[in-house]
Amino acid sequence: MRLVYSLIFLLFIPFSHPNPIPIPTISPETTNAYLRAFLPWWPEKTDFTLRTAPTPEESEAEIVGNLLESSGEKENVTEFATEKEEIDPSTLRVHDLPPSPLDEFAPEGSPKSLVASGARSSDGNFIISFDEMGECPRDCSNDLRDALGIILQDMSHVERYRQICGKYTNAITCVNEDTRCNKEDRDMFETMTSGLNYMCVEQKLAFNATIKCIDDEAGVVQSECDTQCQTKNLFMNWMMKTAFQDTIQQGVNGIVGAATGTNANPLAFLQPVAGAAGGAPGGGWADMLANIGQRPPSPQDAQQGFENFRQFTNDLCRIGDCMLDCIRSKFNTRCEGSAGTLLSEVFVRPIAATQNKLSILRPILGTFMPEQCGYLTNNAELKKHRIDATMDEELKRMYAEKIAKEARDRTAQDEILANLVPLDENGVPLPRALPELKSIESPLDVSVKTLDQLILDMYSNNKTEELNISEKNNVTSTFSEPSEKEDEASTTVISVISPLHTNATDSEILEHISEKSTEESSGSSGEMSGDGSDNEASGEGSGEYDASGSSGDNSGEFNSSGSSGEASEEGESSGSEDQGSGNYKMIESIESSGEFSGSSGEGSGDTASSDTSIDDKSIIRSGEGSAESVSEILQEASGEDAPTLTPTSEESTGYKIDHSGFGESSGSSGESIELRDSGEGSAEYDASGSSGDNSGDFNSSGSSGEASGVGESSGSEDQGSGNYKKIEVIESSGDYEFSGSSNESIEQSKEGSAASIYEILQAASGEDTPTLTLLSEDSTGY
């Protein structure tokens, strides 16, 4: 991109330097030959010369006449030495073409003295220079010169754009505010800086939006345009050609001087000090080059110089035209479809403004300029590089609306943030800055709460209650008493299962458990201790088997048969002393002491060969039923003497059985059997004993149906049991089998049935079949 800027700088360097190509004073013959080589129509004999010395002031009519008339029309020119005649610029136009709608200055509005001031250049060239300006434009153009220097500096285009626009703003402010600047000075300054005004003022919003993209894509665009326009090859060829021609010219001049005798010493140009011909003082190589530069060129040299100038200018204009087309198309493709057109307008707008100001000289300049430079003098050829008026207005409107929308969005966001969070003077959110706002402490604020307090707050809803365990009464153990540590650990083991009834919700189950926890928290002597079992069966053919004991070996698989349906489920085995083993997959415990709740269905079993005595039994009924007529049940079960029932305690719902010869069993005393009917018509069988070896196979036979499952054993001496909402047991070791015996506890749920109960009682007694009578109308016991 810097190469593009350099190219534009070379194209318009005559506007910033008073005499970029100094032409020495030469003879009229040489000048005429020089001009005829460049201009075929130039007359052979004319007194017109390019002079550097000031000439007498001539009128505008004379200047125009000398440039336009032919040799045959020269005698008709009238000279006005003292008077000045105003000429209408419109009558001098050769190409009457409409100007671009983007041109701010029309040809008719140009200053009338502009042509005269341009024609009265001291060096004979129509060049506008900063040095020829008055005090106002000269002093205010310092920033503009700095802006031209910024073009060649190595920096990003974003920074270059910012600095150039800053320099231009300072310069235009100086021209507008300086009282020494008149209208003509301001008009000239605006013409020269019209491209910068378009970039920094008119289309400022568009360039602000696209300059970042221009900077990102400039490297790729420059490489592609250099290849397309062959700029590097052109400049390299001209450099080599110029150096080669200079070397040849120096050698030819030395040889010609030695051959003609103009140089006394043919090798004088190689010596540091040598005398010139005719006794003139001479120097070395540098003096010879200086003399060659000062010597008037011959007609052949002048013709070759003009030819070289035309060729170089032609190539330069061709590259400029190619680069303008290339950067416009490449940047339009990459940057929002308009960046290339905007840049092209910045480059060519000063040319268009100059064409409109110097419209009277465009035909003359067109005759001197090569064909490839036609767009510099012809407004029609320049139009292809300019932006369309409609597109220019649309870009202004589009970017103005875009900026306005962004401003509205930012304002709306600021208002929302201001209402949500107050800000201090630095824009930092301060939620506690305003006193009227109530500060809200974050639960994760470590400065307010410690980690321990956070943990307690998180689990504050999961409250626990102390587990109450009844005292040890009437318990005889054949094993040593557990240690204090084992006893304390065993009290925390909870092996009570709370089945999920199909018709009951979790809240109802929890409420039921809470009501029963206070009534059945402690039992009679020997309650919830020793070896035993708990068998429950659901109405849908599923159940869980649970057994707890403190002494004895409680491990294995429990098989039981019920009265109706098939019940299979996985149980759990645990204990404190010689306890069984089992794997727990998931346990959700709701603590309660001494309560069992069973699922719907019924389960029954006979305890025999269990190494336990039934001399001292306790029978408990819970739920909607009661423990009425328990004596009748036992009397009917034995067929002989009815056992004596004695309450185990005042607050207990169990009874102690004084019985002798009631069935056959081996083992120690102190077994307690609990039989409960839940409020939802569900039942659960639980048996616990204090001593005995409950190992081996237990078989429980019933009248109809089978109930089998992997059982569970847990507990310790005088240990209460809690309610488990869900227990999944993976495995348990050992097989337990119950065989029927006398004095069997029987329970019927509301959803189950008591089929073949006579057969159960007959198998239990071995003799007479007792008569079954309902205890009450609402009761399910017999």
From Swiss-Prot:
Residues 513-726 are annotated as: Disordered. Residues 1-18 form the signal peptide. The keyword DNA damage does not apply. This is Chondroitin proteoglycan 4. The gene is cpg-4. Disulfide bonds: none annotated. Residues 520-532, 548-566, 573-612, 662-672, 688-722 have a biased composition (Low complexity). Glycans are attached at residues 76, 208, 462, 468, 474, 503, 559, 691, 699, 701, 704, 708, 714, 721, 743. The keyword Glycoprotein applies. Keywords: Glycoprotein, Proteoglycan, Signal. PANTHER family: CHONDROITIN PROTEOGLYCAN 4, F18A1.7 PROTEIN-RELATED.
